[in-house]
Each structure stands twice: as structure tokens, then as C-alpha cells.
């Protein structure tokens, strides 16, 4: 249930909010795609924690680049 809710929230962000904001993620795949994949693969708790850590790393002073879900 929590997994389903988090995936729906991420999808809502991707469809309704993200198109209206300038691109700012320095990673590939983007943080929202990373979060969706991580939660799908590892579940709400572990995937959610991985997503939080990824978003915390996404700032202008980071290297960025290719960073897939392990």
C-alpha cells in the first residue's frame, strides 16, 4: 500500500509538476525516475531511503552524471 502511494506521488510529480519547472537534476536518470525505480525494485522503506539519499546528493556542487539504481 505504501509502495503504491509513493509511486503514484512520484508519477504525479513527473506528469503535473515537473513539466512546469526548469530542469535541475544533474544525474541520469533524474531523481524522480531514480526514486520510482528504487521503490519499485526495493520497496517503500529501502527504496524510499535510497531516494532521499539521492535527492540529498543532487545539488549544484556535486559531480552528477550516470547514477543508476543498483
Curated annotation (Swiss-Prot):
It is a peripheral membrane protein. It comes from the Bacteria. InterPro entries: Membr_insert_effic_factor_YidD (IPR002696). It is found in: Cell membrane. Keywords: Cell membrane, Membrane. SMART domains: Haemolytic. Pfam families: YidD. One of its GO terms (cellular component) is plasma membrane. HAMAP family: UPF0161_YidD. Belongs to the UPF0161 family. PANTHER family: MEMBRANE PROTEIN INSERTION EFFICIENCY FACTOR-RELATED. Could be involved in insertion of integral membrane proteins into the membrane. This is Putative membrane protein insertion efficiency factor. It comes from Chloroflexus aggregans (strain MD-66 / DSM 9485). The lineage of its organism: Bacteria, Bacillati, Chloroflexota, Chloroflexia, Chloroflexales.
Amino acid at each position: 500500500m505504501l509502495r503504491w502511494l509513493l509511486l503514484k506521488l512520484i508519477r504525479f510529480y513527473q506528469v503535473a509538476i515537473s513539466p512546469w519547472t526548469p530542469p535541475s537534476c544533474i544525474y541520469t536518470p533524474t531523481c524522480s525516475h531514480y526514486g520510482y525505480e528504487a521503490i519499485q525494485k526495493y520497496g517503500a522503506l529501502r527504496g524510499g531511503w535510497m531516494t532521499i539519499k539521492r535527492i540529498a546528493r543532487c545539488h549544484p556542487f556535486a559531480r552528477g552524471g550516470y547514477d543508476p539504481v543498483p
